[in-house]
């Protein structure tokens, strides 16, 4: 029996090696690092020295029976992101001597969770930070939560008569809803509501810009974009508002250039076009006060600071500077008063504060043991494969001849394929086919052990790493917890939260709990590059191997679905104290199986009763004893109260 072990890449593995491997110092934005124990640490804010140990936190949450998978939300990071956004705009206003203010709003669609929105409103209250809503349900949330009468409530999305009536009447409550006209037929509904309610709303217009956008959401802008008015439609709307004596309520211009804009040049072009539209609206007699630059402010998921879909080639300060400078220049050239600037920056505010933690249930990988069969009566094609394996073993510790290794690898692949053909035709037994596959894996492992990283990545050998990769089974549903990974191939930073004093010599990807081949994570940030495999540790027997998926705060909870009936995970809100301790502020318990079934109109009581009737029948037929039936029913009733995820 021959054993082949994972190749050790370095004699001594350091924390700096882990930081470089996972690019933590680049995408972590100073919020995440690795401490002296080799665990991920979380910082209170980018200016603070206060940190907590994430691995220790998860272990202590487990002692409270708050088990993975779970979302940990760091309130301090959320607050710091809001502060950073405002600080950037305040610096830009001061630098460019802008004669008005920045007043942001948070788009509710990014994260509708009550605890999250309450924190955002609280943290942003000193700046009159408001909300942006895109439906009647979100409008009701905004009206209920926004108590600051100086905050803005930007009303976007499709609007029927009821939506417009609610927003119009809410102004009499002292609220500041601004109804943004995004479709031409909304003008008529607004005029009708004013006539019927004897109340006037604040009005805005969303413009369709002709500037070109980029990235995954590039089609959010342009003549064929989903929302907004073309220039001719804007002219007609202004005419109708004047005729209805509503032009004095026209206060805001809004535009949107897509989400996660990676290239600052795209933002500049859109700002120039929108600023000129704003100037022209003022010239047409609208008493404009606000320009809403929408969303699009991106974050650096991969830490490369480039214009790729998963990064940005600009900083928060760059963004604020360009917004302020561009709007100022257009207004001053036309003697127009500087407007209050609004942005709908969701992803940039909410992403960093949430970390999804899951445990690894097990792994699968190519066999690490090779059975050497008796050569007597051995099929020729298997003998050829075995001979190739021995040729590769002879090269161990010798000077590398890459062309010879490539030739031997091509031979191994050919002989393995010959074995598969022979098996299909009935010339090889199942045991012989298994041996052939083990030989091919052994050839791959010998090559991997003899080559360095650059050599193994040769185009003719690169598939070897994939062949030897392990699958790590993750205790989570990708479709529920990180649906963007599946739906749009969004890259999130994924890192073990402990064991960073050890070399992660395994290469692997993750498979989730669902019975779906799409339920895999196989795109990772590796030393600043996107790769299909991640450096991971071999899980230790009877010990948790815990993985963190970072920057998951935007959209994931809202978009997650119940594929295979895996429900919401535990959610914990954490405050980091000045003494490097923490306080658990909120715990939102995971969905039980009973709660999930109830969502689909299944009554737990009815299900239990149906199964009970079946057990009684089985008892009558002597298929089940009374004791077995009792144990079965007990387990079912307990299970209904428990998590949909796997437990220890």
Swiss-Prot record:
Modified residues (N6-(pyridoxal phosphate)lysine): 109
Binding-site residues, substrate: 291-301
EC number: 4.1.1.19
Tagged with keyword Lyase: yes
GO biological process: arginine catabolic process; spermidine biosynthetic process
SUPFAM superfamilies in UniProt: Alanine racemase C-terminal domain-like, PLP-binding barrel
Biological or metabolic pathway of the protein: Amine and polyamine biosynthesis; agmatine biosynthesis; agmatine from L-arginine: step 1/1
Named cofactor requirement(s): Mg(2+); pyridoxal 5'-phosphate
Molecular function terms, GO-annotated: arginine decarboxylase activity; metal ion binding
Superkingdom of the source species: Bacteria
Keyword DNA-binding: no
InterPro entries (UniProt xref): Ala_racemase/Decarboxylase_C, Arg_decarb_HB, Arg_decarbox_C, Arg_decrbxlase, De-COase2_CS, De-COase2_N, De-COase2_pyr-phos_BS, Orn/DAP/Arg_de-COase
Catalytic activity entry: L-arginine + H(+) = agmatine + CO2
Record key words, sorted: Decarboxylase, Lyase, Magnesium, Metal-binding, Polyamine biosynthesis, Pyridoxal phosphate, Spermidine biosynthesis
Family per record: Belongs to the Orn/Lys/Arg decarboxylase class-II family. SpeA subfamily.
Function: Catalyzes the biosynthesis of agmatine from arginine.
Full protein name: Biosynthetic arginine decarboxylase
Protein source organism: Prochlorococcus marinus (strain MIT 9301)
């Amino acid at each position: 029996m021959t054993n082949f072990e994972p190749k050790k890449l370095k004699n001594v593995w350091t924390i700096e090696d882990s930081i470089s491997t996972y690019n933590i110092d680049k995408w972590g934005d100073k919020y995440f690092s690795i401490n002296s124990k080799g665990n991920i640490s979380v910082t209170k804010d980018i200016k603070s020295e206060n940190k907590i140990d994430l691995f220790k936190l998860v272990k202590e949450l487990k002692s409270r029976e708050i088990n993975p998978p779970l979302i940990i939300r760091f309130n301090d990071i959320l607050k710091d992101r809001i502060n950073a956004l405002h600080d950037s705009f305040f610096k830009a206003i001061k630098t460019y001597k802008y004669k008005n203010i920045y007043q942001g709003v948070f788009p509710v669609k990014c994260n509708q969770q009550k605890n999250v929105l309450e924190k955002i409103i609280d943290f942003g209250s000193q700046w009159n930070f408001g909300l942006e809503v895109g439906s009647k349900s979100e409008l009701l949330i905004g009206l209920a939560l926004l108590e600051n009468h100086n905050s803005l409530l930007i009303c976007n999305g499709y609007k029927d008569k009821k939506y417009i009536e609610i927003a119009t009447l809410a102004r009499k409550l002292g609220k500041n809803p601004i109804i943004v006209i995004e479709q031409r037929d909304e003008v008529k509904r607004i005029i009708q509501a004013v006539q019927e309610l004897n109340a006037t709303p604040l009005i805005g217009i969303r413009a369709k810009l002709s500037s070109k956008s980029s990235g995954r959401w590039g089609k959010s802008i342009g003549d064929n974009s989903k929302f907004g008015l073309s220039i001719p439609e804007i002219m007609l709307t202004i005419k109708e508002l004047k005729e209805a004596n509503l032009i004095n309520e026209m206060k805001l211009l809004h535009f949107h250039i897509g989400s996660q804009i990676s290239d600052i040049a795209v933002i500049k072009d859109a700002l120039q076009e929108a600023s000129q539209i704003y100037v022209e609206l003022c010239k047409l007699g609208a008493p404009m006060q606000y320009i809403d630059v929408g969303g699009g402010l991106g974050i650096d998921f991969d830490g490369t600071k480039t214009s790729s879909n998963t990064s940005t080639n600009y900083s928060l300060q760059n963004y604020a500077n360009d917004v302020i400078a561009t709007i100022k220049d257009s207004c001053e050239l036309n003697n127009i008063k500087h407007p209050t600037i609004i942005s709908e920056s969701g992803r940039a505010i909410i992403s960093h504060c949430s970390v999804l933690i899951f445990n690894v249930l097990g792994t699968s990988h190519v066999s690490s043991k090779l059975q050497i069969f008796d050569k007597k009566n051995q099929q020729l094609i298997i003998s050829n494969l075995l001979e190739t394996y021995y040729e590769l073993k002879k090269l161990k510790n010798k000077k590398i001849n890459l062309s010879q290794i490539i030739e031997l690898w091509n031979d191994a692949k050919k002989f393995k394929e010959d074995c598969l053909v022979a098996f299909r035709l009935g010339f090889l037994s199942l045991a012989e086919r298994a041996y052939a596959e083990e030989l091919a894996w052994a050839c791959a492992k010998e090559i991997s052990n003899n080559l360095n990283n650059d050599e193994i990545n040769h185009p003719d050998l690169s598939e070897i790493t994939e062949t030897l990769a392990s699958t790590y089974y993750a205790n989570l549903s990708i479709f529920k917890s990180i649906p963007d990974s599946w739906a749009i191939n969004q890259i999130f930073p994924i890192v073990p939260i402990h064991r960073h004093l050890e070399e992660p010599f395994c290469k692997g990807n993750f498979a989730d709990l669902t019975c779906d081949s799409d339920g895999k994570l196989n795109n990772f940030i590796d030393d600043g590059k996107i790769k299909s495999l991640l450096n991971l540790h071999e899980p230790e027997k009877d010990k948790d191997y815990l993985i963190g998926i970072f920057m998951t705060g935007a959209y994931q909870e809202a978009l997650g679905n119940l594929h295979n009936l895996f429900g919401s995970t535990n959610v914990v809100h954490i405050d980091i104290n000045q003494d490097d301790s923490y306080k658990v502020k909120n715990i939102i318990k995971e969905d039980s199986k009973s709660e999930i079934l109830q969502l689909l109109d299944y009554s737990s009581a009815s299900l239990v009763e149906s199964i009970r009737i079946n057990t009684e029948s089985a008892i009558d037929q002597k298929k089940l004893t009374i004791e077995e039936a009792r144990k079965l029913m007990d387990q079912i009733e307990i299970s209904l109260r428990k998590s949909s995820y796997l437990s220890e």
